[in-house]
Amino acid sequence: MKSDHDIYLFREGTHAKLYNKLGCHLQSNGGANFAVWAPNAESVSVVGDWNYWSGNVDRLDLRDDGSGIWQGFVENAVRGQGYKYRIQSSHGSYGVDKADPFAFYAEPPPATASRVWSLEHDWKDDQWMSSRGPKNALDAPMSIYEIHLGSWRRQDGHFLDYRELAHSLADYVIEMGFTHVELMPVTEHPFYGSWGYQTTGYFAPTSRFGTPQDFMHFVDHLHQRGIGVLLDWVPSHFPTDEHGLGYFDGTHLFEHSDPRQGFHPEWNSSIFNYGRNEVRSFLISSGLFWLDKYHLDGLRVDGVASMLYLDYARKEDEWIPNRHGGRENLEAVDFLQTLNKAVYREYPDTLTIAEESTAWPRVSRPTDMDGLGFGMKWNMGWMHDSLAYMQQEPVHRKYHHHKLTFSLVYAFNENFVLPLSHDEVVHGKGSLLGKMPGDAWQQFANLRALFGYMWAHPGKKLLFMGGEFGQRREWTHDGELEWWVTKLEGHAGLQRYVAQLNRVYRSLPALYQLDFSPAGFEWVEADAADTSVFAFLRKPREHGAPVLIVSNMTPVPRTNYMLGVPLAGFWREVINSDASEFGGSGWGNLGGVEASPVRFHGRPHSVCLTLPPLSTLIFEHVPHA
């Protein structure tokens, strides 16, 4: 039952486990308790399959503590039945049937009722859960495979369910060497074409792919196979569907009443009122719910930029300044800080990642340093500049050289994830492979070179499904990926390259331990615009051996290319994007080169390399015995 302390935390905006108190909860001796927040309702009834959807049978009682919570026991409710709250507003004659904001399960869309359900599961991921802290740490290798469950693979045109996906996805992710998967939102959503970003069920995995227990099995199985699971989570807005959160009790309860604050013009959706404490408790509880009940390893928070700015996607007269006259959404800032503090307090071995596309400062810095408190942030600037550079014909790249070097000016201002996400392969943008210039051979070579540069660049890695084998058409949610192309040599070679790149990345601490420290990076050749060559060192902590990375972004092979290196000994070529096995031309350095005692680039030793066309090479230093 809800204690006075629960009510206090709820109204203070700091209750992090409301899902244990509100919503529908089956009782061991039969029946279920129901509770819903509707402070402006005149009456609330539970209508469902057991009472033939009559509003005259199971009426709830309003608590007398001013919380606005209606509650009651329904004797005849059993697991699996559909239900809604029939709300009669105290404002006029407005009445509506609403889905339960705290429902654990819902009917498959287009049906909109909630389902009576419970969340028991015999978890078998103890080994993962007890040891995941180092795997999710900032100094760990992190190569994330972003996936949309409805369009990764299908069976005869139909969705795979959570259990089928668990086994086939785990096999594939292990084969490809990724460390984590990031799921585009699985929170219940009425419109499949929203990809999950128009959420109505903040505590329910979508029933399109099975039950809550099926999704628990999905996470459990991936954990048992050593794969972390991250979830896209959307506290930035919600859809206006009648059964959802909007105008919940005849008033703008979850959203602002003024459309200049409460309506999102770009997404045609409602914006949460982050200044309302009960709404904050709802959202914080939703975020922690997935970490608690589903053992997820982290949240990627969608649309953070839209939350931070009151004038986001608005014309000059379409927004209301904050109390200081500024454009910053102070309530959203405070909410995000409170959310991150709650996550890291309750689940310190998980992580939060912000999708934030502006230069808002200290997104991934602790709240006690006036930061937002996220663990990491997507580096949208790196993504835009890198793709803009790679889309240039190689002959023109010398005029855009800075687009690949500029990211290192700010690379350590935040804890960055480098994303090549679903956003880059939709809405007419084409596929990653399709963005690359040249003939088919050059397109594959360009994409391999980009991936090599990306995996060596400071920051964790994220790649959307299909990019790893060079999907030809841009992504669509209405079918599966073009798996058939992996039988073609160029695509198969790219797929082998990404798998090997992941293995090399995970084996070399220099490529991940100091992702967020300037001590982990050093330019060797930053200004060779005329040759479009880039060379840099990545360094591990504790004086470990550095790794040399060299990219040649033209189709001209270069021989006897001299670069300064800090150490004598053998520099072993651990991966070459132009290797024949990956579909390349086979140029290379025959396994590596010996450093000469010739000073160059201000360093005591140097190497003379063969740089293949459109390639990235990674060299590991091997000291002499």
Swiss-Prot record:
HAMAP family: GlgB
Assembly description: Monomer.
Pathway this chain belongs to: Glycan biosynthesis; glycogen biosynthesis
Similarity field: Belongs to the glycosyl hydrolase 13 family. GlgB subfamily.
One Pfam family named in its UniProt record: Alpha-amylase_C
Descriptive protein name: 1,4-alpha-glucan branching enzyme GlgB
Gene that this polypeptide is encoded by: glgB
NCBIfam families assigned: branching_enzym (TIGR01515), PRK05402.1 (NF003811), PRK12313.1 (NF008967)
Function: Catalyzes the formation of the alpha-1,6-glucosidic linkages in glycogen by scission of a 1,4-alpha-linked oligosaccharide from growing alpha-1,4-glucan chains and the subsequent attachment of the oligosaccharide to the alpha-1,6 position.
Listed GO biological process terms: glycogen biosynthetic process
E.C. code: 2.4.1.18
Active site: 302, 355
